[in-house]
Amino acid sequence: MSGRRLKRAAWNPPLAFLLPLPNNGIVLTRNNARLTLDGARAILAVAEKKAREIKVPQNIAVVDEGGHLLAFARMDGAKLSSIEVALTKARAAALRRAPTGPSPSSGEPSILLSLGLPLATEGKLTCIRGGLPLLVEGQCVGGIGVSAGTEDEDVLVAQAGVVELAKVAS
């Protein structure tokens, strides 16, 4: 009996093919800009140069739009404890499509947000400043995260990378 049921089930095609497609069956795709390894390296090089200018050795991470690592540099003398922080900042900026840090309305992160966001995301997101989204024509193609200096120094170095992307993307 169970063999018979299986046999019958095998002949029943899935009903998904009966559902209508949106747009009268026309499937639309969109050309999306992508951050390449060469682009990530160019961003990283400029950010690293800025870190040298301000004399703060930094950990710098560049990720794609999905938060996956494309390029990373740990400058000589950068804090080892900040490696994962830089990656988390880059990932958070890319995935949230927004700079890391307190929300513009509050100005200061609440203790709940500061602790809750990393805990709720198993350490994958942060509200510490120093992560910026990388945008091309309004589309997020990745993120840059910088850590080892003060939050202001981290943001300054990350901004240098964002400016470089604007140059190479135009």
Residue ranges of each PLM-predicted region?
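Basic polycationic patches enriched in arginine
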Residues: R4-R8
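Flexible, solvent-exposed loop/hinge segments and secondary-structure transition points
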Residues: P20-S170
